[in-house]
């Protein structure tokens, strides 16, 4: 039978999982489906006590992924790089909880890039500048993507949009580099 989705918490606490390859382009990936850290309660600050760290270092997805990625879908991912896809629908925060993420790669053939709110909340503050390739017409950045410190735009006609819903600060971008022209 064809897999239509991966349920919420499906691989929860599977710390030995190293690679996820999604071949289906319309599957729904549930909340915390790959929350692979093994925890034992919470510390005094309310943070989970991790007793066995995740080993999930590679996520492979179809280029045109038309499925639904729910909140914290890949929160067990401990890789340092993620290749963005031509997403058309997903919930906010699907990369939330990826604390080792340092680099987001945007393919050159994308026309629009939509970074949902809360997507990069928990990434380290060492997240490298986002480099938007030439040919991208529009970039939409949702609320609370706190760790985006710099965006480098390679195209002369790329438009950067932000979401400032309900008066909240959308992002704390310190620097935007644009190609002259």
Give the location of each predicted region.
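Short, aromatic/basic amphipathic alpha-helical patches
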Residues: 72-73, 162-169
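Consensus positions within tandem repeat domains that build extended binding/scaffold surfaces
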Residues: 7-10, 31-33, 72-73, 93-94, ...
